[in-house]
Every structure is written in structure tokens, then in C-alpha cells.
Amino acid sequence: MKKLTTLLLASTLLIAACGNDDSKKDDSKTSKKDDGVKAELKQATKAYDKYTDEQLNEFLKGTEKFVKAIENNDMAQAKALYPKVRMYYERSEPVAEAFGDLDPKIDARLADMKEEKKEKEWSGYHKIEKALYEDKKIDDVTKKDAQQLLKDAKELHAKADTLDIIPKLMLQGSVDLLNEVATSKITGEEEIYSHTDLYDFKANVEGAQKIYDLFKPILEKKDKKLSDDIQMNFDKVNQLLDKYKDNNGGYESFEKVSKKDRKAFADAVNALGEPLSKMAVITE
């Protein structure tokens, strides 16, 4: 009897040991999987850092050309450069929060400054936009504003390598930006003087899509259906924008966009924002 009891005890211990080994193996697999996802997130974030650096580098180069046109009193050239140069900045807007006070210095609208009772501090691209498109003149004030804009663009470019960009900021920033496009930018408030809003919209969508593209391999492992849904909605938004392309590789004036198409675009961006907001699943 004692021998049987000993045998049963040994068997129980052996089974328990095997169970512990299986548990350790499962924990090890989970840990390796988590480490793999973290590595992929880190790689995607690093790639986005590079993308942002490239956009801000081109933004600075374009701003230098834009300011030179202002200095030369070349209004036609300044107007030609204005929407195209701004696209580099607008592609980076999902992480504009990381730009600190340089964002309002470069991109603030007069309405925002008035709301904050800071209109005397207004500077940046939109102030020069007003001079070019509404006041239709380049004077000493415009040239002074252009020099300040260039100074701020250089500072932002220098700051690019130190920006604190993390997956959460990228994901939330892209959702917030598209929500802004669908609810306020769609009214034409962003480019109120030049009506070059479609350039901004395209760049905003491209900036958000870059984030999706970088995280797509991770998302497809977690939720393939969600990934496909996001891609489908990006395609719909881009198709609507393509409708207003001009023959020079740019976009028509926003004034030419019908109310029906403005609503269709806002609806499409909202439809994109809903699944895009679920992309945070990749960090879980």
C-alpha cells in the first residue's frame, strides 16, 4: 500500500511538473510575441520619424523659395508656391502637437488669434496668404512676416530630430486631424483667402495614410477586417479628391466644390475616421 501511495505521489508530481513546463512555454510564447510587436511598433515609429524629417526638410526648402519670391516682389511665383509648399507641413500635422508653439507661429489662422485675443501676435503662412490673395500686395510688412516665417521654419527643421513621437501620438493625431478636416476645415476656414483647401486636404489624408501604411502589417495580424475597412475608406476619400484635380498636377479652387460634394467628402472622411480610431488595438 505504501509502495502504491508513493507511486501515485510521484505520478502527481510528474503531471504537475509537466503542467508547469507547458505554462512556462505558453508564457514564453506570449512574451516573445509581445516583444515582436514592440519591435515592429518601434520600427514603424522610427520610419515615421524619418518621414516627418523628410517632410519638414522639404518644407524648409520650399519656404526658402517662397520667401525669396516675396523678397523679389514676385506675387505670381509666391502664389504658385504657396499651396504646394504648405502640403509638406500639412502632411506632418498628425504630430503637430509635438511642434510646440512653432505650430501656431507657422500655421495659425486670424480667426483663432482673434478668439484668443492675440491678433497682434499673428504670424506665419496664413498672414502672408491674406496679403497675397486679399490685400493683393507685397509690402515691407509682408517681407518682415516672410523673414519671421523662414526663421520659424528653420527652427522647426532643427527641432525635427528631437521631436517626441510615439505610436499613441501618431494614431490619435491622425484621427484628430481627419475629424478636424470633416468638421471645420471642410467649411473652407483654413485657406479662407486663397481657397487652396484641397491641397491641404490631400496632404492631411496622405499624412494619416502614411501612419496607417506603417502600422498596417501589425494591424493585419490583429484585425485583418479592420485593416481592409480602413484601406477601403482611404480609397473612397482619395477618389473624391481626385475628382477636383486640375491639369497642372494641383487642385481646383475650393470655391468650385459643390455643396453636395463637400458633404460627400465630409461623410467619407467621417466614415474613415471611425475605423481609424480603432487602430489603437495594435498597442494592446
From Swiss-Prot:
It is found in: Cell membrane. PROSITE patterns: PROKAR_LIPOPROTEIN (PS51257). InterPro entries: EfeM/EfeO_iron_uptake, Imelysin-like, Imelysin-like_EfeO/Algp7, Imelysin_sf, Iron_uptake_EfeM/EfeO. Keywords: Cell membrane, Lipoprotein, Membrane, Palmitate, Signal. This is Efem/EfeO family lipoprotein. The keyword Cytoplasm does not apply. Belongs to the EfeM/EfeO family. One of its GO terms (cellular component) is plasma membrane. A lipid is attached at C18 (N-palmitoyl cysteine). It comes from Staphylococcus aureus (strain USA300). It is a lipid-anchor. The keyword Lipoprotein applies. Residues 1-17 form the signal peptide. A lipid is attached at C18 (S-diacylglycerol cysteine). NCBIfam families: EfeO (NF041757).
